[in-house]
Amino acid sequence: MASYKDVKKVVLAYSGGLDTSIILKWLQTELGAEVVTFTADLGQGEELEPARKKAEMLGIKEIYIEDVREEFVRDFVFPMFRANAVYEGVYLLGTSIARPLISKHLIDIARKTGADAIAHGATGKGNDQVRFELSAYALNPDIKIIAPWRDWAFKSRTELLAFAEQHQIPVAKDKKGEAPFSVDANLLHSSSEGKVLEDPAQEAPEYVHMRTISPEAAPDKATVIKVGFRKGDAVSINGVEMSPATLLATLNTYGRDNGIGRLDLVENRFVGMKSRGVYETPGGTILLSAHRAIESITLDRGAAHLKDEIMPRYAELIYYGFWFSPEREMLQALIDKSQEYVEGEVTLKLYKGNVMVIGRESEKSLYSDKLVTFEDDQGAYDQKDAAGFIKLNALRLRTLGKRNLAK
């Protein structure tokens, strides 16, 4: 076990669930530390008052429960979506992007309360331990961090349940009496891991999905919506302006009702192993399609292609936990500059798990129907100019061809 003998007061990222409830008791009994709890309302869709009551039952005096939904979407989700960020081609980073925000608040509360350490419930096998701790160290290089999963004797969720029963800690269970799926949820997404999901050859049971109906059960009639953008961020739906969190929640509803946003993924964790997860990102899936569509008419080709080139690196930085790194901030500045004229409206058709762009318009559009028309363009473009363009671009290819044919 790491040495925590100098730790007197700890701020715990507390959900009220299995891991963090036992960690709370462990911090009290094993370390003798005073515990402060922090619970973030990230839009996970559950009442947070039970977490407060459970913390009080366990003897906690300083309890912080904060609604961070607007901050989450405005300062973390939207900047990420300006980049069209996806990890390994498909994952919209719903869990990854929430971790730096939680760490930020843990550090703030530690400063307010005079705590000398923070603690989290991430396991020693996953990415979240890295994300929490890299963010925390970036914001407070001297903070002590306690990660009980790396130190205590428990090796499984079964042992945790036994400990919880021994200490009379109430823990939710499924109908079979087993611990629930490992679930993470926020306003952007939900993820499920563990139990039958650990076999990547087996289809995930329908009951795993919490945020969406199945595409097969979605309405037979398509839903058409319009999403408005300003400087790269979504600001309205069907002409009605909304706050960032309200807008994402509204897109979630549209996505849920049309079976949009399901993903069954085996991903490469930062720590080196592969893991299987079932993700649901209904609103984010719609938002990504809409954002790429508005960029298609407002971004110059060179800018658009450069964004596509740097996106995998940007997404990887978020996935690995480097949100507060200088390289992520440098890339963000470039991305934000690209969004200066990304404004307008995108029309989308939602149907049985599909998001189809059917229209896009912008006062800043670079699309010119006069240039691309198959009809008389009234002299807007002289097709003879293409001959010289092709000849110059073919120069090196012709030179290479002559050499190769001379063999």
UniProtKB/Swiss-Prot annotation:
**GO terms for MF:** argininosuccinate synthase activity; ATP binding
EC top class, in one word? ligase
What is this enzyme's EC?
6.3.4.5
Q: What catalytic activity is recorded?
A: L-citrulline + L-aspartate + ATP = 2-(N(omega)-L-arginino)succinate + AMP + diphosphate + H(+)
Q: Name one GO biological process term.
A: argininosuccinate metabolic process
Give a yes or no for keyword ATP-binding in this entry. yes
InterPro entries in the record: Arginosuc_syn_C, Arginosuc_syn_N, Arginosuc_synth, Arginosuc_synth_CS, Arginosuc_synth_type_1_subfam, AS_cat/multimer_dom_body, Rossmann-like_a/b/a_fold
One cellular component (GO) term of this entry? cytoplasm
Instruction: Please name the PANTHER family in this protein's record.
Output: ARGININOSUCCINATE SYNTHASE
Which proteins does it associate with, and in what oligomeric form? Homotetramer.
Q: Under what name is this protein listed?
A: Argininosuccinate synthase
Q: Whose protein is this, by species?
A: Rhizobium etli (strain ATCC 51251 / DSM 11541 / JCM 21823 / NBRC 15573 / CFN 42)
| Gene this protein is translated from | argG
